[in-house]
Amino acid sequence: IYRRIDSISYEASKIAIPNEYDKLMSAIGANGTNAFTSQDMTVYVEDIPSNQIDNWAKIQADRFKNPVIRGFHTELETIYEEKNMSLTQDSRKVWEAMDAALFPNHPYGTQTVLGTQEHLKNPSITNVRNYHKTYYVPNNMAVCVSGDFEPDEMVATIEKYFGDMQPNPNLPELQFEPEKPITTPVVKEVYGLEAANVMLGWRLPGANDKSTDISDIVGSILYNGQAGLIDLDLNQQQKVLSAYGYASTQPDYSSFLVAGRPKTGQSLDEVRDLLLEEVAKLREGDFDEKLIEATINNYKMQLMRSFEENDSRAILYVYSFISGADWADEVARIDRMSKITKQDVVDWANKYLGPESYAIIYKREGKDPDEQKIAAPKITPIVTNRDSQSEFLSEIQTSQVQPIEPVFVDYKKDMSQFEAQPGIDVLYKKNETNDIFTLIYVFNTGTENDPALNLAFNYLSYLGTDKMTAEEIASEMYDIACSFYMNAGANQSSIQITGLSENMGKAMEIVEGLIAGAKPDEAILENLKGDMLKSRADAKLNQSRCFGALQRYLFYGGDFIRRTTLTDPALQALTSEQLLAKIGGLMGKQHEVLYYGPQKEAEVKSALAKHHKVAADLQPLEKKFSTLLPTDANKVVLAQYDAKQLYYLQFSNRGEKFDVAADPEITLYNEYFGGGMNTIVFQEMREARGLAYTAW
């Protein structure tokens, strides 16, 4: 029957106009066309110019009211590939196993987002249409918008185009048997080629339960990336290769999750026991009460960051709608959280994080006995008819809208530059939006100059000073809602400090004090070396990491890899003195400082003079760029990986230099061939032939 469908689809494509949604979005200047599906929602995303709101609403209303399902069989092949991709994503296997263990009576656990292979082998376009008729109705959907528009005008426009949609009075309500309490650990195992790890999960009430505010605070007390119990007791103390934990909130049920990766020679059960010890501290109240206030301050800062962008503001509306929450409750959340006490946290942990009421998933290395690739049916490429178009598309293309005048960055007016001292140029831009600052020191040197730089930065994060231990540094930075990050690229290194502007001076003092006065610890260094070797071995088990390494080899060659990567013997030979000297040496080099925050130029200059401790006479650093290898012959570079699908890339470098005059043509060419869903490569590879999940 599929062969017959394929044949008819090909014949029909000769006379049919292809899917035009991507062309419509391009016509109105939209970006970021996307959609995603999770267990509780399907979300369609667009980033549109504010002068195209009317056209956008017209298109979307027609799309949801009168869908025409084109390219069904080629798009089905794409879903096959997505399913095959998931078979080699061990993290996805762990998630699905955890949901099955925690929610055996609820669709969270009884089915997956992608469905089973049998589901995908037996699709029904009739069922797709019935699903749309049932659920794509106004009493089951929301339009969540954020941006440059008048609210009343936006509401009127949405009413104009969506107002005649008919509700479904018989909209099905999800019926499920309430889950029974877990009284003894539920144990499951999954297998895959990637590195071993373990995850534990506890079932929680749904998003609208009053305890949800506490669950998020508890998640950050346990792990926040800086000063949580797992951060300080496990990661900082190097007791595991890595560990984390958090609360995952969903409408019907939520979950509290902790996970970890073992060090060399460490068993998954040992990691499990360490994680359980940290969770037990929540029940026993064995944590600093200051973590609650610090968590709330950091949550406020995260909200400020999310309010900087339209997409993150809109997604807050999405989550509120899906969970069925009142927006007023969302707005009042920080006020509620500020009233939570340590006893509230302890009581909550004893109620929901019992010592036996969890599920555990062991992700072990090995061949997955349940893995079965979906055999892709043979597809005859359909005719795309790119030159044919509907009257609707023509109408949108010829519609007249009020032009938006582009605003181009003027680097002389929109930002400023000044010299903090000879050898340190500052690029300054004032933050007019909120009270968050970002301060970055940028050095024109990297792993191509010294392959040990990243190890040096990593080592520094585990150390303390004469005045503060490493744990005290992490806790203090979290208390003041600030953080720092150090990284070395091939030719450039950076030290970044960010957080609440009122605490910038204190944060600079802590970070600069660590750089200047870190106390070496050989035991930490030896542990770190062992963890790096383990991480390298784990990376070789990951398909995308292997492909990334293959790309670097293809682009830059083996010499570049050798220059930028420490060999195992070279890694083992490094001493604390050598590593700390590398970081201290950076403060004797010329560099740039990038500042974005609410402080005035004079205040930034004063802060740098007071806290940024550098040599009086800074040595210059020559700016270098990694050299791409010329493509002088056809060749194939292959890295074998036992997966059900491949990562594929073609690359060519003719050695041409950048020409600013040619840049518009290059941009146009890239957009035409690979810039989106209506481009030549995507349409030929996915829509016409069903050969790839994504292509560009």
Residue ranges and their predicted role:
Residues 80-88, 177-189, 295-306, 497-501, ...:
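Short, conserved secondary-structure transition motifs
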Residues 212-213, 664:
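Zinc-dependent metallopeptidase catalytic helix centered on the HExxH motif
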Residues 62-69, 162-169, 276-287, 513-522, ...:
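A common structural junction motif
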Residues 150-190, 197, 231-232, 304, ...:
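Proteolytic maturation boundary segments
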